[in-house]
Structure formats: C-alpha cells, structure tokens
C-alpha cells in the first residue's frame, strides 16, 4: 500500500499528458509546478486550465490455464489550476514573479481483479490459506507464551483487541478452519479438507489528490527558479473475497475490508537555466522532499464457514470482527522517498517543442513511524520490509509537440518506469497483524505511450 501511495500517475493538462510529462525544462504549463516548479516562471501572462478524462481500466489474470478479465470505465476530473503572472520590469534582473495553484489527481487506485482454480499440493499438504492461518496462530501463541508465560486464547471474543494476536489466525480458529494441537496448546494445525478450489475477487477504489501552491521567478529571461508546496489528500478503499471449497462441498469465504485515509505535504524546488543566450535550449533540475503523510488504516473481516456436522447435517459458522471491535483503526506516519529530476527542453521557432527527463526515487528508503501520541518512533518491522522488498526506480520521459498552425498541435510522448519491487518481494503478515487479506501484486516495469492533438484559442 505504501508503494501505491508514493507512485504518481501521468496526469494533468492535455498538453502535459500528450507530451508524456516531459515538460520540466520547457515549462509554460500549469502541471509542471508538480514536477519542476521553475516551469511556472516561463509564463508572461495569466492562465487558467482544467481537464477531464475518460479511462478504461482493464486487468487480466491467468491461472491454471484459465483467463479472467475485469474491465472498468469511469470519467474523472483530472486537474484545475491557474497562474497569475506579474511583470516586474524589462531592464531589471528580476523580470517576472508568478504565482500558481493546481489541483490534480496524483494517483488513481481503481482496479478490479479475479481468478480461480485448484491450488495444488505442496509436499504432502494441500496449498490452502488455512496453512497461513495456522502458522500465524502458532507464531503469536508461542511469542506470548515465551514473553509472558500466558496462553493466547483464540476462542475469546476479545481476541481482536489483543495487540499480540493476529487476526488471520484468530478468525481461522473461530471459523473452524484450524485447530489446537492435542499435546501442545501453542501449536495449531489446519483442518485437512483436501485440495481446495479457490475463487478470489478484489475491488479497489479511490486515489490521491494533490494541491500545489507555487511561486516562480524569471531572472533576465535566462534563469528561472520556483518552489511548490504540495498538500495531499488520501482516500483509498479495498475489498477482497477469498473462497475455498472442497470435494465434500465444505468450505469457507473470507471477506476483508480495508481503507486508508489521511493527508500529507511536501516541498518541491526547481530551476531552469538557458545557458546560451542565442539558443532556446534549456536544462532544468528539481528535487522533491518526501511526502510526509499522516494516515489512518481501518479494517474489518467476516468469515463464513459451511461444514457437515457429526450428525450429517449442514451447519454454518459466521465470524464478523465488526461485531466485536467495529472498524479497527491504526494511525501511522509514512515518509515517501526523495525525488530527483533532471530535464532538458528545446524549441524550434514557435512550431516544434522537444522535452526529455530523467527521475530517480529510492522506494527502499521509505519510513514508517508511530503517531506522535505513541512516541513518534520508527515502526521497525514495516520500515525493514520496505528496505527488503523495494528498490530505486528510474523514470525516463520523452515528449514532442508540433504546431501545424499556431492554434493546432500534434503531441507525442513516451514514459518508461522501472519496477519498485525486488524480484523476491512478497507480502508478509507478522504474527500480530490485523490484516486478513493475503493477496498482493508487484507492479512490473511500465511503458506508456501517449498521443494527442490540441487546439488553443483565446477568449
């Protein structure tokens, strides 16, 4: 989830998207205040801009020679902003002081996914989520016994309020999918129902909104400086349903609900230099501080188990954590990586514009912290997981715009972003985790091609 919040989509004005976002050194576009703040210094007049988009999301899953497709279409409001340009003078070193504001959809988190199939057998044991339940229950019980010399009672309805108990193990025990060892009360085993046929579905929605406030300076029409203060709003929800059914029609369904809400801020600094007086070539640099997020994670889970009783009759167990603790909430702080950006731009008259950018972020440096009322110290496990599972990313952006006439332009862009995940990265739930969704997806390297046409007139 942290990687999702730290990533940013290619989004903004139609011109910015059409050129692949490679406008850091070219400037003159409202969206550049979020990449290279100095780009607003290029403006010599006021500007107002807004954009909408229609997106078609598709997810294809393949498992056990079957293919599952999930498509979703939606309209979105992508950005709105303005620039207020103030001329200082023609002969003074400081020529313009410009102010800007822009809202954009920094990250869209809409995605649906599904897959199904037989899970197979590993060694002499069927592959099942119940194995994970039993392992977590065992790890937590042994830790509590070794630390406090007390047993962990998974049958207690207050178990979901115990900071040492993992929810996956607790709901598995209360839902009848794992049992305690007859000789060792700190050891748990999955009930052996055979190889399961599993069905998985997930729905994700929400995103991150970015509000940028900018001031930029034009010095002698050769040097442009800018600073942007960004504010962020996070609203993300996820549902996942995981079902296992067996030959005798027994089985269970685990519904997991989670959401993340919060806010954050960052500071972006940028510069653009036109090194040759008689050339339009520009080179730019930008650095973004980490985004400092204050977040709240909330979750609940519901497990429904259908089984045959010893009498031969069907019975059902329903365990709903919401009945015991409502939405369990955890407050935390997240610091995303620093961002370093180098960009170049070149124009040929008023008809052709070319841009190129390179950007680096090291996701392994992300920090998780406890909230201030809990001491504000590092969350060591989560921070270590980020270091072990994530790595630095390299992003290359290329863009071009050709104006057939002053009002009409063709645009072309390309982005490449390397994966933030190491090859061996997996989702690991510690023994006291309140998460019950065990699914995860590691985003691979990404290639994005953009094509656009634009018409710009005056009112």
Report residues per predicted region.
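Outer-membrane beta-barrel porins/channels
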Residues: 1-11, 16, 85-459
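Outer-membrane beta-barrel translocator/receptor signature
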Residues: 14, 26-35, 41-120, 206-209
């Amino acid at each position: 989830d942290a990687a999702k919040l730290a990533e940013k989509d290619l989004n903004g004005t139609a011109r910015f998207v059409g050129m692949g976002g490679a406008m850091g050194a070219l400037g003159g576009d409202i969206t550049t205040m979020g990449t290279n703040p100095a780009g607003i210094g290029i403006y010599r007049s006021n500007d107002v801009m807004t954009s909408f988009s229609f997106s078609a999301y598709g997810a294809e899953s393949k498992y056990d020679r079957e293919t599952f497709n999930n498509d979703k279409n939606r309209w979105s409001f992508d950005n709105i902003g303005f620039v207020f340009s103030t001329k200082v003078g023609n002969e003074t070193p400081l020529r313009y002081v410009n102010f800007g504001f822009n809202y954009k959809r920094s990250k869209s988190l809409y995605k649906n996914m599904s897959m199904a199939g037989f899970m197979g057998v590993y060694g002499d044991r069927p592959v099942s989520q119940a194995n994970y339940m039993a392992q977590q229950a065992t790890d937590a019980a042994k830790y509590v016994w070794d630390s406090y010399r007390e047993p962990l009672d998974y049958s207690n309805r207050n178990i979901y309020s115990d900071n040492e108990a993992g929810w996956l193990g607790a709901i598995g025990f209360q839902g009848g999918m794992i049992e305690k060892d007859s000789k060792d009360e700190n050891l748990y085993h999955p009930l052996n129902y055979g190889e399961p046929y599993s069905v998985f579905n997930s729905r994700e929605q929400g995103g991150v909104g970015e509000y940028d406030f900018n001031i930029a300076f034009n010095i002698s029409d050769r040097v442009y400086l800018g600073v942007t203060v960004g504010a962020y709003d996070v609203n993300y929800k996820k549902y996942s349903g995981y079902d296992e059914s067996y030959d005798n029609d027994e089985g269970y369904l685990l519904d997991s609900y989670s959401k993340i809400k919060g806010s954050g801020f960052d500071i972006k600094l940028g510069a653009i230099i036109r090194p040759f007086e008689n050339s339009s070539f520009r080179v730019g640099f930008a650095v973004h501080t980490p985004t400092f997020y204050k977040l709240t994670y909330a979750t609940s889970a519901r497990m429904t188990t259908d089984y045959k009783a010893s009498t031969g009759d069907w019975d059902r167990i329903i365990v709903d954590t919401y009945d015991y603790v409502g939405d369990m909430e955890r407050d935390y702080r997240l610091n995303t990586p620093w961002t370093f950006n180098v960009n170049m731009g070149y124009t040929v008259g008023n008809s052709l514009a070319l841009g190129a950018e390179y950007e680096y972020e090291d996701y392994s440096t992300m920090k998780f912290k406890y909230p201030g009322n809990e001491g504000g110290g590092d969350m060591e496990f989560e921070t270590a997981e980020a270091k072990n599972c994530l790595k630095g990313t390299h992003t290359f952006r290329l863009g071009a715009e050709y104006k057939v006439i002053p009002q009409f332009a063709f645009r072309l862009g390309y982005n490449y972003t390397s994966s933030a995940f190491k090859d061996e990265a997996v989702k690991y739930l510690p023994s006291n985790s309140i998460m019950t969704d065990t699914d995860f997806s590691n985003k691979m390297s990404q290639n994005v091609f953009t094509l656009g046409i634009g018409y710009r007139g005056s009112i």
